[in-house]
Amino acid sequence: MSKKEKFIAETTPRYTTKGHFFTLGKGILDGEVIPEVDVNIPLRTINRHGLIAGATGTGKTKTLQAFVEQLSHHGISSLVMDIKGDLSGIAATGEMNSRIQERYDKTKLPYQPQAFPVELMSLSAEKGVKLRATVTEFGPVLLSKILGLNDTQTSIMSIVFKYCDDKGLPLIDLEDLKKVLQYVTDNERGKKELADGYGSIAPASLGAILRSIVALEQQGATQIFGEPSFDVLDLLKTRNEKGVVNILRVVDIQNKPALFSTFILSLFAEIYLTLPEAGDLDKPKLAVFIDEAHLIFKDAPKVLLEQIETMVKLIRSKGVGIYFITQVPGDIPESVLSQLGQKIQHALRGFTAKDKKEISKAVENYPSSEFYKASELIQSLGIGEAFVTALDEKGIPTPLVHTYLISPESRMDILSPEEIDNLVNQSELVRKYNQTIDKESAYEILLRRMNEEEGNSTNTETCKPQQSKPAKEEPSMFESILGSPMVKTFGKTLMREGAKAIMGMIGLKKTSKGSKK
């Protein structure tokens, strides 16, 4: 038996599945594309998470695009973090060209240019569906971790949240929380209420928390707090039997790692709380793709990394897969990397001693192969080629295969401004979430109370300046526009006691919210 025959005989059975799958590409041996070797990815194991890695310019983004398209073909929705701003073309039909024709002549696979259903989303002023969350939804523990508070300050934050809950002071955005902290620090009535009901708290501690909030605001955090909240079930949509590709445009968030980590962790928590337990399904409900994943872990405190690791473990049982896209596997903490079942490794470049160490570490993450010398081949993989290893339907790692990857069927370029406008204007979710809702919250209530105490009804503060609460001008995330925050929270509590208990143990338990007046 020749080497080629042996390669076909040993590899093909391991990538043959009984259930639903998609073909990611064809095997390559000694530089030759082998059409007989299909590299198939079982849909059943998509929720086992994954990694797409490789040096700049090796084709990671196109692989991500093709992967998402294949999921869409099978009615699976996805949420894609688009940090470089080059994935909007998924909404437009691709075009055949000579390079694509050559690729598909070699693979013997059909190629059908087509567009896919897309929703554009944003955390900022970018056009698209606005994603927001209320401060109450984050809760005191998660918010404290984001702010980098110590244990004592975290306890104080929990007391402040309890005070707001008891006094009917809804915390919608950071201006609400800042106003409460100022009230219980500087106002005699506020100080007395806090001391009588919850114990005396040093003004210096409250001031330290306030300064941490201001620091977070400087990273742009005001834009992710507010109303109306986004319902994560709106991510699980299909159109014409294709899964919707939800593209979150976060081009302007690259230099704000704390804000990025905050959003990712809160998103995972909300998905976990909202979706029912599902186990291993024939195909997942949702796949989340995090481009430039190193930004999540960059300078993140240890406790925040632990929370992300925990959520990656837990969310799989909800039928959700998480995929990290980055340059080298070493960008991902070992505790997270060990949980990633699907691995797609594009070329790495060994220009420096550090690069060579990263290559050595990367190769150690993959199964050994008698057909490839991975440490050498990984540096010479062509564009549109990658090492692939996945999990079969039994959860067993498949052999490492040098893979000639499929091309995206949608446009491999961005949408024009006019095309983006048309896409946004046609979106039902934009109409649902982009209306301004400015309900009465802690800021207004306390401001009115202080004005009444002063006996000055003409005080200029009675009308809150628009610029003082910019988040009120933007929609919010993770909380249905229907009903008050209190109703939603208790509803989730009744429906998901098990989820609530688990989230409480890891510090992400939802807190009850005061009703709006």
Predicted regions, residues:
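P-loop NTPase motor domains
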Residues: 68-77, 85-310, 336, 379-381, ...
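Conserved P-loop NTPase motor module
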Residues: 1-14, 130-136, 344, 377-483
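Structural recognition of the conserved hydrophobic beta-strand(s) that form the central parallel beta-sheet
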Residues: 52, 78-81, 122, 248, ...
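Conserved ATP-driven motor cores of ASCE-family P-loop NTPases powering translocation/secretion/packaging/pilus
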Residues: 2, 66-68, 91-109, 310-396
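Flexible glycine-/small-residue-rich
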Residues: 26, 43-45, 54, 122-125, ...
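Basic- and hydrophobic-enriched, low-structure N-terminal and domain-boundary segments
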Residues: 1-55, 62-74, 78-109, 113, ...
